[in-house]
Amino acid sequence: MTALFQQLPSVDKILKTPQGEQLVTEFGHSAVVNCCRHLLAQAREKIKIEKKLPHFFTDFNHTIAEVNRYLANQQQVKIKSVHNLTGTVLHTNLGRALWAQSAQQAALTAMRQNVALEYDLEAGKRSHRDNYVSELLHELTGAQAACVVNNNAAAVLLMLATFAQGKEVIISRGELIEIGGAFRIPDIMAQAGCKLVEVGTTNRTHLNDYRRAINENTALLMKVHSSNYQICGFTCEVSEQELVELGKEFNIPVVTDLGSGALTDLSRYDLPKEPTVQEKLVQGADLISFSGDKLLGGPQAGIIVGKKELIQQLQSHPLKRVLRCDKVILAAMEATLRLYLQPEKLTEKLTSLRLLTQPLEQLRQQAEQLKAKLENLLKDDFLLQIESSLAQIGSGSQPMAKIPSIAVTIAEKNSEKLTALLARFKKLSTPIIARVENDKIRLDLRSVTAIETLLITLEELNQDQ
């Protein structure tokens, strides 16, 4: 064993070779030294346990190659591009909405250059960073004003902290939602320092339930859109319009957490109907919060629209500065909202809506291309078929609603082979993320953004054998 330890080169010896000097030039002295120490520590452990050298210390060229590979891998960003073939278009784990081309360009400009973020070019003086987005939302929804923070949970927190800290907020028991990551409305209320007052039952809440709970300490009446679940059957809920009338009677604001935040009626595209921001405003809600990276199709943000005097109070709260968006997000959000000024062009320019509305025939053509490519690469090892599929919007939007789609399925009696193929998909330079149903890998085309790029990536399957 001692002889094996003696075969290990010193860090200094590696650094003083021409190859080592080249690595220092490329990656820097500290990084190369740390890498060599790491690999030598690995080698010593292997010698202790297995009584042999690791392969990369059996030959000096292998050693240099391993150091180079390790250092190059350190430079690789781990949040990397993937091919989404899950059939879930707004996939939370894969980053939700893909930005439109104009949003990408606006964000890139904001990254590279100084921009008029809080500067009024006409007046030549300081302005507010939310102004451009607020003006657009006023035009698109009819809201008096708007406020932007970094996500919808932050928007709800800001509303509660501003208007209900130390006071009570009344909400239906059937609307105490939990979203991903065990994140619950009651937890946000507790964090905001307000008291939750539940009324009604899980499946039925009446206007009188709210009325009986109102007292001198009631600060808000709250509605939460249950976008990620449905209660069916013997049910009853109070509409915003009814709640607003009750709020006016007692001079209590009504706030609505709309969640997904559609700015256009999805049913016009033969998609499942989702309440729009405009509809909630017409019903009289004082403040409405919603997400920017779900149905709206933009960057992650929490948007609050509503009455000007209430928005001004939100803007003045200390939490607003904590939760505010940076120039890149605001630039991308502005560009995304401007697409809604041309509604006839939305399915062409808004990426998420384009994916959701792709014709089945187009998806079938893509499926045929994908099947042909896979048959060529996988030979006769697997059974490939083109099948009808059911995709979904994702991100908690309309979870019960399915969207017709087309998928390529891969079957194999040996489940270990399917598992191995899935692993190969994930090791590609741009990993392929699929789903498994009924002992088949299902590659759903509804969520694919670029079939040509996917086909090129698949060529790597020939190289990993």
From Swiss-Prot:
GO terms classed as biological process? conversion of seryl-tRNAsec to selenocys-tRNAsec; selenocysteine incorporation
Entry-linked Pfam families: Se-cys_synth_N, SelA
N6-(pyridoxal phosphate)lysine PTM positions:
294
Pathway(s) annotated for this protein in UniProt: Aminoacyl-tRNA biosynthesis; selenocysteinyl-tRNA(Sec) biosynthesis; selenocysteinyl-tRNA(Sec) from L-seryl-tRNA(Sec) (bacterial route): step 1/1
Family the entry assigns? Belongs to the SelA family.
User: What is the predominant subcellular site recorded for this chain?
Assistant: cytoplasm
Provide the protein name. Answer: L-seryl-tRNA(Sec) selenium transferase
Question: What is this protein for, i.e. what is its function?
Answer: Converts seryl-tRNA(Sec) to selenocysteinyl-tRNA(Sec) required for selenoprotein biosynthesis.
